[in-house]
């Protein structure tokens, strides 16, 4: 049975809830949740097209010496054979997404983004 995000927020930390919500959005864009990888080990064989993402840092806002707006930044990479994929625009359209760069490596096009939640 799938849990709603509300149920998940009662089970996981705020950061993990944000990550799981992002994972769902990325899986929806890719159309295949099994090819969305969070911090995969280097020796793992990936299936393409794929989205790989890592925690890239964060920032916090404070008022009266109390943290009230924690943010997590994710480094997201779309890896596929198509250099002009519509998936690039779909990821760019996500809330707080910034397109960083793209390059070709080993015959695969890699598009890098930063997404803050």
Where are the model-predicted features located?
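Short coil/turn motifs at beta-sheet boundaries
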Residues: 46, 67-71, 106-108
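Small/polar-rich, solvent-exposed N-terminal microdomains that initiate assembly or binding
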Residues: 1-60, 66
């Amino acid at each position: 049975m799938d849990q709603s995000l509300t149920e998940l927020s009662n089970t996981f930390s705020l950061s993990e809830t944000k990550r799981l919500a992002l994972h769902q959005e990325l899986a929806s864009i890719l159309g295949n949740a099994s090819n969305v990888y969070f911090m995969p080990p280097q020796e793992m064989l990936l299936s393409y097209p794929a989205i790989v993402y890592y925690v890239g840092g964060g920032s916090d806002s404070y008022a009266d010496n109390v943290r009230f707006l924690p943010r997590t930044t994710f480094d997201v990479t779309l890896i596929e054979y198509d250099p002009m994929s519509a998936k690039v625009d779909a990821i760019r359209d996500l809330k707080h997404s910034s397109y960083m760069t793209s390059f070709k490596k080993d015959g695969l096009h890699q598009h890098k983004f930063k997404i803050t939640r």
